[in-house]
Amino acid sequence: MWLAPGGVRQQGEGGQTRLKFWSFLFACCSLNLFPSSPLPLSANGLATVYHALAAQNVSPAPAPALRVDPKAQVLFDQVIQTLGGQAFLGFKTLTTRGRSFSITDEQTTGFVTFESQVEYPDKRRFAYGLGKKKPIVLINNGDQAWEVDRMGLTHQTPEQARRWKITNAYSLENLLRLRTREPGTLIQDAGSDFIQNLATRVLDISLANRVDVKLYLNKANPLPVRITYRVQDPKTLEWDEYADIYGDYQSFQGIQTPMHITRFFNDERISETFRSTAKYDEVFPASLFQPPEQ
């Protein structure tokens, strides 16, 4: 026998259920969990609710499981092994050098040489320029984004930072090593198609964040040929179409690395990157992904 909120004595299983409900309700009210509160719940608040639920033997809903149909699983495993197996899954950094072209209306509008240093999943330093001039440096570190040029330090524009976060999230490396392993992801065999005059197999990847990705694989290898995905613009609410074409794979440190990458935005080719060198697992100082001291 025990006292429920309000001093009402309860007995038996039904009374225990009512006690759990009122205890949970009280915890929610104490933490302002209802829609009348304009502020999001803090991490401490979430932890408190979790412990309150645990104390009442009420388990939070489990995260949705990763789902892969059997045909897709076989194909996905082949992709990982072809790219390098554990060497591909385990590398932490990638340094590349080469040339990059910007394209507008199918005409080349710019050309630079570059050095790119990436620490996965979300840090990069990209230095580009021409000749002996001091290069422009783009630095991204999670949600932070800076640009360093001959005039000094500034922040990247919000749109510039947003675009990089999107394309980085669904890059070959992050898609296959992170996104496809997130809870709630569904991977299905989507049949065959022709891309870049190549016969391909297609995997349809539906992510928990409601982004749909298509991964096109060369039937002969099977190396990734193309990745396409749609992301909604938060301002216009229009759906933007992104596509990356991967080619000229070469092996570096046991990892098959695409040396030619072409990017499309809403069906328009906007850039081509030709890598000349690639090196994995260089150790970078933390300061590499921070703005220089002024």
Q: Where are these predicted regions, by residue range?
A:
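Acidic/charged, solvent-exposed loop-and-adjacent secondary-structure segments enriched in E/D, K/R, S/T
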Residues: W146-L176
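Signal peptide processing junction and immediate N-terminal pro/mature segment
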Residues: L33-P60
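Gly/Pro-enriched, hydrophobic low-complexity segments
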Residues: G131, S192, Q196-E293
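N-terminal mature ectodomain segment of secretory-pathway/periplasmic proteins
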Residues: P60, L66-L153, P183-G191
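Bacterial N-terminal signal peptides
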Residues: S23-S36
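Intrinsically disordered, glycine-rich low-complexity segments
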Residues: A4-Q16
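Short, conserved active-site entrance elements at the starts or edges of catalytic domains
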Residues: I166-V202, P224-T228
